[in-house]
Swiss-Prot record:
Organism of this sequence: Trifolium albopurpureum
Organismal lineage: Eukaryota, Viridiplantae, Streptophyta, Embryophyta, Tracheophyta
Predominant cellular place of this UniProt entry's protein: plastid
GO BP, sorted A to Z: mRNA processing; RNA splicing; tRNA processing
This protein's name: Maturase K
Subcellular location: Plastid, Chloroplast
GO molecular function: RNA binding
Length: 506
């Protein structure tokens, strides 16, 4: 945030709050490269970071300055001098630059709102996505119905650009952004296909995620306004979800604009026990009341997307289920409410009674099948979960191979330590351990048994299972009972800023 403030102040001294000049500054692309290089991920990234160089950036900026090169022919985009022979590479650099520039004013607004709320010290802890699960454990055990909602993608990227125009008043910047989107990313057709959306999101992830998250923020601002108008008890805990950038100003703006139209509490949405949780493009709506009110919210979402955002959504895509009978998926976990029944003997005078007590507990389970499917896609095992070697890593040293497998295993263990049942997590560790051994045996052109016999013993890769115990022993007393208890219980971490990349939440 400090770097953003410095760069924006430097631009203000020259161009009166315009974002357009920042596109032609070399340090913006250096900042984008630094952000990608330092991002903590679970699977190694083979993106354009290794190809980044200041010479490429200077060459790109020089071509952008020459306005005649910005007149693009859609039929001749592969030979355009603006992109040269590295169309995809330059396109990715430009998209990273756009994302950095357009994020600057919103990061500044976010930092100022944090300073006003006096919660800077706890900001990093509150950013952890694991902080969502204690909320679920505390609230969802008292609820009966859950609605699993997938927020639809906009039919055209122009909708996202139009939404962004309400917040950033810089016409030249949006002209250049549209030029980039329509000609470099194949968005010049009236209705882009699902394949083109997927291609753009993979080749330009940062810019796409920013535009998509901004679209979600717009939808949630309207949802929050109507939710607050439907209850006598106003919502107070929404501010901890900091991904809703510039949320306070938007909420005040909505209250000011629509106060005349909604001057009384909406009677048809009254539900004092409704909870809403979202991460990325998926949200969970849970309630204690009958499904009738949940259906009202369901059709409200559908009409909101269709009327305000021109996004088509089918009612069958939103399911309403009982929490005790169905599970929902969020942040790479499967969650459901389990009923625990216990019998208590009670005695009054000479009479004895048996009382059955039913309590609810939120079960959060590791999704073993999607994880095995992701491991199979990454060539660590087959579709049945049988470990296989990874020959593409055989050129590395033994230490590097072991370190790569350990890094993935460590991050998976770190992320899924909050699960109710750890057996699935141990199975994933077992797959990675055997895959590592088979990769080393393949490198040395030997069988697994001969390699382990030559190496000394099967304790060669014991770090896969002992490292977590060593970390816990540094935090808690070195007591076997204590460590065993923490291995069985859930452990949520406050430094998880990204979801597990091996679970594709689609």
């Amino acid at each position: 945030m400090k770097e953003y403030r410095v760069y924006l102040e430097r631009a203000r001294s020259r161009q009166q709050d315009f974002l357009y000049p920042l596109i032609f500054r070399e340090y913006i692309y250096g900042l984008a490269y630094s952000h990608n290089f330092n991002r903590s991920i679970f699977v190694e990234n083979g993106g354009y970071d290794n190809k980044y160089s200041l010479l490429n950036v200077k060459r790109l900026i020089t071509r952008m300055y020459q306005q005649n090169h910005l007149i693009i022919s859609a039929n001749d985009s592969n030979k355009n001098p603006f992109l040269g022979y590295n169309k995809n590479f330059y396109s990715q650099i430009i998209s990273e630059g756009f994302a950095i520039v357009v994020e600057i004013p919103f990061f500044l607004q976010l930092s100022s709102s944090l300073e006003e709320a006096e919660i800077i010290k706890s900001y990093k802890n509150l950013r952890s996505i694991h902080s969502v699960f204690p909320f679920l454990e505390d609230k969802f055990t008292y609820l009966n119905y859950v609605s699993d909602i997938r927020i639809p993608y906009p039919i055209h990227l122009e909708i996202l650009v139009q939404i962004l125009r309400y917040w950033v008043k810089d016409v030249p910047f949006f002209h250049l952004l549209r030029l980039f989107l329509y000609h470099f990313c194949n968005w010049n057709c009236f209705i882009p296909t699902k394949k083109s959306i997927s291609t753009f999101s993979k080749s330009n992830p940062r810019l796409f995620l920013f535009l998509y998250n901004f679209y979600v923020c717009e939808y949630e601002s309207i949802f929050l306004f109507l939710r607050n108008k439907s209850y006598h008890l106003r919502l107070k805990s929404f501010s901890v979800f900091f991904e809703r950038i510039f949320f306070y100003a938007k909420r005040e703006h909505l209250v000011e604009v629509f106060s005349k139209d909604f001057s009384y509490t909406l009677p048809f949405f009254k539900d004092p026990n409704i909870h809403y949780v979202r991460y990325q493009g998926k949200c969970i709506l849970a309630s204690k009341n009958v499904p009738f009110l949940m259906n009202k919210w369901k059709y409200y979402f559908i009409h909101l997307w269709q009327c305000f955002f021109d996004v088509w959504s089918q009612p069958r895509t939103i399911n309403i289920n009982q929490l005790s009978e169905h599970s929902f998926q969020l942040l790479g976990y499967f969650s459901n409410v389990r009923l625990n029944r216990s019998v208590v003997r009670s005695q009054m005078l000479q009479n004895t009674f048996l009382i059955e007590i039913v309590s609810k507990k939120l079960d959060i389970i590791v999704p073993i099948i999607p994880l095995i499917r992701s491991l199979a896609k990454a060539k660590f095992c087959n579709v049945l979960g049988h470990p296989i070697s990874k020959p593409v890593w055989a050129d590395s040293s033994d230490f590097d191979i072991i370190e790569r497998f350990l890094r993935i295993c460590r991050n998976l263990s770190h992320y899924y330590n909050g699960s109710s049942k750890k057996k699935s997590l141990y199975r994933i560790k077992y797959i990675l351990r055997l895959s590592c051994i088979k990769t080393l045996a393949c490198k040395h052109k030997s069988t697994v048994r001969a390699f382990l016999k030559r190496s000394g013993s099967e304790e060669l890769l014991e770090e896969f299972f002992t490292e977590e115990e060593e970390i816990l022993s540094l935090i808690f007393p070195r007591d076997s009972f204590t460590l065993h208890r923490f291995h069985r219980n859930r452990i949520w971490y406050l430094d998880i800023l990204f979801s597990n990349d091996l679970v594709n939440d689609e």
